Swiss-Prot record:
It is found in: Cell membrane. The chain crosses the membrane at residues 58-78, 89-109, 130-150, 176-196, 203-223, 329-349, 364-384, 406-426, 441-461, 475-495, 522-542. Its main location: membrane. Belongs to the major facilitator superfamily. Proton-dependent oligopeptide transporter (POT/PTR) (TC 2.A.17) family. Expressed in flowers and siliques. Expressed in vascular bundle of the siliques and in funiculus. It comes from the Eukaryota. It is a multi-pass membrane protein. This is Protein NRT1/ PTR FAMILY 2.12. The lineage of its organism: Eukaryota, Viridiplantae, Streptophyta, Embryophyta, Tracheophyta. InterPro entries: MFS_trans_sf, POT_fam, PTR2_symporter_CS. It comes from Arabidopsis thaliana (Mouse-ear cress).
Length: 576
């Protein structure tokens, strides 16, 4: 989508403003309560109800999560190019409610799950049959389709309700973001505490409540229809990227100078109305510049391209370069997500082996232990933004840049995995001595992982949004879930490989179904070592990164390291 000035709003419609946002935020909050409420404890559902081994349950869960995080890229394409954001959210919401109903039925109907088993080892119980697995996977597929439509469109659809040409509209957008992330944090905490607790009491109740909330979300979304602003689709930026690549390939035999000396004539029309960033021609990825070189027959008598798949503007070429430059930094964030998702998953199994009592009458649900990370984020982010950043600026005239924040987050991920390995080693030793370890020992790695998310993931989102032109923000907002998709698939591959190669006839594998016989701490150490290698790779990418021309954030060039940044080069950067 283009920026506001290019929006094609139906003339009889007024800007929705906060009347519309009330329905959009209500829908988004209830939808997330439904989807997260099911996924938060789903590993234990696969383990205890469908009797899957830990590795099998891990693979099913993360293959589903990978599909769920990849789907928003397709959802953004369909929304921008074909049906618009409202219809995308509407259709996706129906798929989400259908998916939740299907998963709930697998818990309600005895024909749709294996018979209950009181054996303390679920792997010795009856396996699910093909029909039961098929119904379960069908429900998960519906949920992935729903997430693919809702995630990439909910924030842009909310922004559409404000006129950003006015000061009031800009303030409304800023306030909308604050409310959006506040409600998301509340949903995460509620889902990992109240909903998870209800699921320990009854899976039927624990799944029925998220399903009911999702149904309320769908109703609320349609009730607000008369208040919404509807922006027509104007075509996807993906087609522009494809045109640049095709045009450059068609002119691959063209010889151009490495330095712009005026011998080539480039196509540089006036930028479209409302485009705030006019990108100059850069000296990176010169092979793409061929797409903008004007040859005989490329222009019509009116001065426009005769074939848009043969001639592109400098602006279009530079937009593709922005994407190419970001990819290495994007890839460096995947290992940290692998660490986070792997730790959160296996810690649920660890918690089942530990003392979870708070007082004589209450036992903490195993899946609720991960809420410590969210609490850490909620405490640390305000401290960082309102205390630490102003303090560093007053004392040293120093601000932590986005890439530095991401690097610090990677370090915290490494420390978290080393700490998790140490805690698991102590837990397993005590288990052999027939003594249980308090579950609150897991708070140490979870707090460190919460700090990783506060630095790395928030910095990554800001980085993506600062390094793309305005109308490419849909790509920027798709890259983050796409990194989770890549991490989910990599996690599944890593777990499967370690499970197969780490065991022998005389020694169980590291990820044995019985944690007391396995070596989960070794697996944590392996991911920590991968994190160290990834930190070196990230430093190299950050060291060589060239910021988008005109960007106010220029904290790296080929002669500056991760920590060697002069304050006067950051004076225009807002605290982050």
């Amino acid at each position: 989508m283009g920026v506001v000035e290019n929006r094609k709003i139906l003339p009889e419609k007024k800007l929705g403003g906060w009347r519309a946002i009330t329905f959009i935020l209500g829908n988004e909050t209830l939808e997330k309560l439904g989807s997260i409420g099911v996924s938060a404890n789903f590993m234990l559902y696969l383990r205890n109800v469908f009797h899957m081994e830990p590795v099998e349950a891990f693979n099913v869960y993360y293959l589903w999560m990978g599909l769920t995080n990849f789907a928003p890229l397709l959802g953004a394409l369909i929304s921008d190019a074909y049906i618009g954001r409202f219809k995308t959210i509407a259709y996706a919401s129906l798929f989400s409610i259908l998916g939740l109903m299907t998963v709930t039925l697998t818990a309600c109907l005895p024909q749709l799950h294996p018979p209950p088993c009181n054996n303390p080892h679920p792997d010795e119980c009856d396996d699910p049959n093909k029909l039961q697995l098929g119904i379960l996977f069908l429900g998960l597929g519906f949920l992935s389709i729903g997430s693919g439509g809702i995630r990439p469109c909910s924030i842009p659809f909310g922004v559409d309700q404000f006129d950003q040409r006015t000061e009031q509209g800009l303030k409304g957008v800023a306030s909308f973001f604050n409310w959006y992330y506040l409600t998301l944090t509340m949903v995460l905490i509620f889902s990992h505490t109240v909903v998870v607790y209800l699921q320990t009491v009854s899976w039927v109740i624990g799944f029925s409540i998220p399903t009911s909330l999702m149904a309320c979300a769908v109703v609320l979304f349609f009730v607000g229809m008369r208040f919404y602003v509807y922006v027509k689709p104007e075509g996807s930026v993906f087609s522009g990227i494809a045109r640049v690549i095709v045009a450059a390939r068609k002119k691959r035999d063209l010889k151009i100078s490495l330095v712009d000396d005026g011998t080539e004539e480039y196509y540089e029309p006036p930028v479209k109305p409302g485009v705030l960033s006019k990108l100059p021609l850069t000296d990176q990825f010169k092979f793409l510049d061929k797409a903008a070189v004007i040859l005989d027959g490329d222009l019509t008598s009116e001065g426009v391209p005769a074939n848009k798949w043969r001639l592109c503007s400098i602006q279009e070429v530079e937009e593709v370069k922005c994407l190419i430059r970001v990819v290495p930094v994007w890839s460096a964030g995947i290992i940290s997500i692998v660490a986070m998702t792997t730790q959160a998953t296996f810690m649920v199994f660890q918690a089942t082996k530990m003392d979870r009592h708070m007082g004589p009458h209450f036992e903490i649900p195993a899946a609720s232990i991960t809420v410590i990370s969210y609490i850490t984020i909620g405490i640390w982010v305000p401290i960082y933004e309102h205390l630490l950043v102003p303090f560093l600026w007053r004392m040293r005239k120093f601000r932590v840049t986005l890439l530095q924040r991401m690097g610090i987050g990677i370090v915290f991920a490494i420390l978290s995995m080393f700490t998790a390995g140490f805690v698991e080693g102590v837990r397993r030793t005590r288990a052999t001595e027939m003594t249980q370890m308090s579950v609150f020992w897991l708070a140490l790695p979870l707090i460190l992982m919460g700090l990783c998310e506060s630095f790395n993931f928030i910095g990554l989102i800001e980085f993506f949004n600062s390094q793309f032109p305005e109308h490419m923000r849909s790509i920027a907002n798709s890259l983050f879930p796409l990194s989770f998709a890549a991490a989910n698939y990599l996690s599944s591959l890593l777990v499967t490989t370690v499970h197969k190669v780490s065991g022998t006839k005389d020694h169980p594998d590291w990820l044995n179904k019985d944690l007391d016989r396995g070596k989960l701490d070794y697996f944590y150490y392996l991911i920590a070592v991968l994190g160290v290698v990834n930190l070196v790779y990230f430093w190299y990418c950050a060291h060589r990164y060239q910021y988008k021309a005109g960007s106010q954030i220029e904290d790296f060039n080929e002669e500056k390291s991760l920590l060697d940044i002069e304050p006067n080069q950051r004076h225009d950067q807002s605290p982050s």
